[in-house]
């Protein structure tokens, strides 16, 4: 209950702040053009702010320890492997980090190809063979080389804009309909209007999540193919097969999960950021 209240309160606060900022900027959100500007600024603004702080957030939320000086042979091999693959892919050497988790997973993040982070879990580092780990690292380096972080940020910005714009257009239509059937012509009123906007934000947000998840799944297949080029198809398949045999991964912050090697299973495949591992293995074998 507390979480729901905080979610509603946060949404209301964002709307209030957004309205104040738009008023200061002189943008009239009562017109379609003004509303579209409002939606684009906050839709893309939020997405790009998330991208800009993605490395910092990853280090804080996942407890990533960046390897500056390798402490043992395993860490040295890890850094050397990422360096070799980054050179093959034609990108600047990413920061390499380890985070403490028993699950088999890894992720890449960062605002650009030349400012990125590749992190692996301790469970993966000490629970997989070097060939399998090399396949995982190649997948993550491929994400960076393909510019997937920026691509998904742009997609997220577009769908955010759609959600903000569409929710308020539909809410205005409902408000006008209520006003036309009300003797006093008052419409929904401020609080009812904000409640309708909140519900529509949630509904359109679910649709938007499906769209982003679809593009994420497409990028996963491409990262697998890129990983196969960097490490070899057999190592990429071996890595995915090992992940398929392992336990289901736990929760990971959405921005990191989108570029993880192993996605969380979902009853609705439409909401999955990663295709099923079986399909990914089949796609690699078919190449």
From Swiss-Prot:
Where is the secretion signal located? none
- What detail does the entry give on cofactor binding? Binds 1 zinc ion per subunit.
Instruction: Cite the GO molecular-function annotations of the record.
Output: metalloendopeptidase activity; zinc ion binding
User: Could you give a single Gene Ontology term from the biological process aspect?
Assistant: proteolysis
Its main localization is membrane
Magnesium listed as a keyword: no
User: Membrane topology type, per the record?
Assistant: Multi-pass membrane protein
Q: Which catalytic residues are annotated?
A: 140
Which Enzyme Commission number(s) are on file for it? Answer: 3.4.24.-
Its keywords, alphabetically, are: Cell inner membrane, Cell membrane, Hydrolase, Membrane, Metal-binding, Metalloprotease, Protease, Transmembrane, Transmembrane helix, Zinc
Its Gene Ontology cellular component terms are: plasma membrane
**Which enzyme type, at the first EC level?**
hydrolase
Transmembrane regions listed in the UniProt entry: 4-24, 33-53, 154-174, 195-215
Q: Where in the cell is it found?
A: Cell inner membrane
Is Zinc given among the entry's keywords? yes
UniProt binding sites for Zn(2+):
139, 143, 220
Cofactor(s) the protein needs: Zn(2+)
> Of which family is this protein a member?
Belongs to the peptidase M48B family.
PANTHER family referenced in this protein's UniProt entry, alphabetically? PROTEASE HTPX
Q: What is the protein name stated in its UniProt record? A: Protease HtpX
- Recall the taxonomic lineage recorded for the source organism: Bacteria, Pseudomonadati, Pseudomonadota, Gammaproteobacteria, Alteromonadales
């Amino acid at each position: 209950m507390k979480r729901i209240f905080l979610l509603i309160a946060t949404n209301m606060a964002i709307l209030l702040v957004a309205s104040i900022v738009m008023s200061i900027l002189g943008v009239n959100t009562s017109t379609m053009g003004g509303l579209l500007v409002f939606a684009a600024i906050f839709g893309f603004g939020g997405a790009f702010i998330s991208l800009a702080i993605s490395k910092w957030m990853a280090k804080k939320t996942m407890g990533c320890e960046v390897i500056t000086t390798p402490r043992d042979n395993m860490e040295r091999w890890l850094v050397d492997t990422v360096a070799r693959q980054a050179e093959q892919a034609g990108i600047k050497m990413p920061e390499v980090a380890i985070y403490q988790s028993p699950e088999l997973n890894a992720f890449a993040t960062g605002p650009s190809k030349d400012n990125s982070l590749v992190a692996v879990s301790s469970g993966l580092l000490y629970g997989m063979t070097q060939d399998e780990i090399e396949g995982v690292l190649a997948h993550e380096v491929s994400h960076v080389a393909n510019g997937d972080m920026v691509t998904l940020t742009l997609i997220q910005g577009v769908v955010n804009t759609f959600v903000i714009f569409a929710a308020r257009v539909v809410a205005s239509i409902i408000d006008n309909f209520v006003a036309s059937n009300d003797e006093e012509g008052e419409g929904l009123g401020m609080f009812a209007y904000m409640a309708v906007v909140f519900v529509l934000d949630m509904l359109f947000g679910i649709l938007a999540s499906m769209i982003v998840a679809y593009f994420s799944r497409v990028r996963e297949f491409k990262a697998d193919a890129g990983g196969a080029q960097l490490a070899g198809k057999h190592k990429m398949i071996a890595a995915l097969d090992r992940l398929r045999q392992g336990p289901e991964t736990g929760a990971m912050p959405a921005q990191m999960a989108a570029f993880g090697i192993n996605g969380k299973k979902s009853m609705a495949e439409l909401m999955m950021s990663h295709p099923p591992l079986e399909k990914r293995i089949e796609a690699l074998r078919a190449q």
